[in-house]
Regions:
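Residue-level signal for the nucleotide or nucleotide-sugar donor/cofactor binding architecture
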Residues: 14, 67, 119, 123
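Short, solvent-exposed segments of well-ordered alpha helices
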Residues: 7, 60-63, 115-119
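Short, charged low-complexity linear segments at domain edges
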Residues: 1-7, 37-57, 104-108
């Protein structure tokens, strides 16, 4: 099997720019051809998950997120079904609130089966 594509995927967004407008860091940059480029240097999701620095750039707004950022995803019409299906319930929210004050051992144990375990404890504390 080869990685060949005969027809490029069409931009199904049309004139919708909800994601561009929702991004707190304006990281979706317009290109001359009408497409957009995600400038990860501005993206809160990149910084809260992948950036291992002790501090985050001052210009990056986290908009209440300590892990990732879903502002663009939450407004996308393509994601409406997924967004309503995977919303946090009160139990999930309570567990995350408890982690805010957790020590490192508790954090590691509580997140071992979660996507949240991708970040180090120091990043978790930095991002709050």
């Amino acid at each position: 099997m080869t990685d060949q594509y005969d027809i490029p995927m069409e931009n199904g967004c049309g004139n919708c720019h909800r994601c561009v407008e929702a991004c707190p860091n304006s990281c979706l940059v317009p290109l001359e051809n009408g497409d957009y480029w995600n400038d990860a240097r501005r993206c809160a999701s990149y910084h809260t998950i992948e950036n291992r620095a002790e501090t985050l750039p001052d210009e990056v707004r986290l908009s209440g997120y300590a892990f990732g950022c879903d502002c663009c995803q939450l407004v996308c019409p393509y994601n409406i079904k997924a967004a309503t299906r995977y919303q946090l319930n009160d139990n999930d929210k309570g567990r995350l609130e408890q982690l805010a004050d957790a020590d490192e051992a508790t954090f590691k144990k509580a997140t071992r089966h979660m996507a949240l375990n991708r970040i180090k404890y120091a990043q978790w504390k930095r991002n709050q």
